[in-house]
């Protein structure tokens, strides 16, 4: 979505396909870092973005045993926003979609699922998709697959994946947040255990890290 916004802002005709009817996927990336916020400033979106509901994290703290340790402090960064912003991914994507829609070269098609690639002289030259209105074909000089770890576009293009593996995984859950809960402690580390907490306003988004 961000790439589509930036390209359309530069005058490039862009078509973005989203297979779902909305962006409501829980437990996705909700962190918007100071470097990204700086880009938002550079393209004129920062003030509008900061008016949207979000949480700000100026530092990252860990609870290790009985000790609280600050492991990152963003107050010294040479950026306008010296914090990580937390905003549900669906809200951020909707925000970018609204910003992009102001450009006549930005086209977002919801409920459009990629089913194939168009080929020309051995190169990808567009996509084929299914929509409620019927099949859709889009000719394109550039096709970008931003459809996740199980990318349909990547599979259709027969691109190989180098799996580096990971020694751990995370169990995600949500826990109600009480008014008297402590401040933005982002993680707790014990003997062989790691718990990550993300403040989502009225609840905690929690990741319990487990070995694979």
Pin down the residues of each PLM region.
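Generic structural signal for small/hydrophobic residues in well-ordered secondary structure
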Residues: 2-4, 18, 40, 96, ...
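Active-site-adjacent segment of FAD-dependent monooxygenases/related oxidoreductases
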Residues: 33-99, 118-121
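A conserved short coil-to-beta-strand element within the FAD-binding core of flavoproteins
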Residues: 110-124
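Conserved dinucleotide-binding and phosphotransfer motif residues
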Residues: 3, 8-10, 102-104
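Conserved FAD-binding catalytic core of PHBH/FMO-like flavoproteins
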Residues: 124-125, 130-136, 142-212
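Glycine-rich FAD pyrophosphate-binding loop
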Residues: 6-28
């Amino acid at each position: 979505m961000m790439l589509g916004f930036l390209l359309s802002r530069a005058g490039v005709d862009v078509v973005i396909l989203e297979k779902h009817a909305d962006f409501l996927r829980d437990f996705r990336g909700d962190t918007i870092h100071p470097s990204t916020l700086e880009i938002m400033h550079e393209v004129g979106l920062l003030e509008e973005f900061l008016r949207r509901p979000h949480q700000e994290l100026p530092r990252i703290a860990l609870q290790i045993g009985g000790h609280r340790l600050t492991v990152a402090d963003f107050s010294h960064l040479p950026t306008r926003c010296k914090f990580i912003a937390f905003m549900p991914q669906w809200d951020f994507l909707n925000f970018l979609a609204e910003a992009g829609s102001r450009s006549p070269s930005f086209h977002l098609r919801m409920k459009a699922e990629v089913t194939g690639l168009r080929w020309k002289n051995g190169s990808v030259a567009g996509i084929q998709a299914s929509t409620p209105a019927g099949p859709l074909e889009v000719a394109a000089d550039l096709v970008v697959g931003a459809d996740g770890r199980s990318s349909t576009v990547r599979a259709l293009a027969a691109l190989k994946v180098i799996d580096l593996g990971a020694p751990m995984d995370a169990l995600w859950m949500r826990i109600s947040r009480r008014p008297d809960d402590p401040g933005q402690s982002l993680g707790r580390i014990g003997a062989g255990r790691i718990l990550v907490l993300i403040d989502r306003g009225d609840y905690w988004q929690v990741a319990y890290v487990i070995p694979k």
